[in-house]
């Protein structure tokens, strides 16, 4: 089975994200990342995960990719199955799917408690 890479939508693909506002997708899209995802999809399963409705992301990215000649296909994942394995199709969900790698603008790489405590002592200051 091919490993899965999970990309967050807001702050990663949807750049310039500055809060929910009215719920629309108002920022710029990282077109270079979408093109790179096309390349990655040859070796990995690709998933986009977000708090947004998956339907909104699929409709937006389908239109964006058609307009910009980006060869990606998107499909809403079945929320009863958190594993994605459709070759060449990007799964989209508002759940946290199984993945080998998570790409997120707000993540922390946890290695051990000592380093996490040190990070937390400076967090939010």
Locate predicted features.
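Catalytic phosphate/metal-binding cores of nucleic-acid and nucleotide-processing enzymes, i.e., regions
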Residues: 1-125
């Amino acid at each position: 089975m091919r490993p899965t890479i999970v990309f967050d939508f807001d702050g990663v693909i949807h750049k310039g994200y500055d809060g929910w506002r009215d719920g629309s997708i108002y920022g710029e899209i990282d077109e270079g990342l979408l093109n790179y995802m096309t390349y990655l999809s040859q070796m990995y399963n690709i998933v986009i995960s977000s708090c947004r409705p998956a339907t909104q992301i699929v409709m937006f990215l389908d239109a964006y990719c058609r307009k910009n000649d980006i060869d990606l296909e998107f499909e809403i994942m079945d929320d009863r199955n958190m594993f994605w394995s459709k070759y060449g199709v990007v799964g989209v969900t508002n759940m946290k799917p199984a993945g080998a790698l998570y790409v997120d603008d707000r993540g922390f790489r946890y290695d051990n408690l000592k380093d996490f405590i040190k990070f937390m002592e400076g967090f939010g200051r």
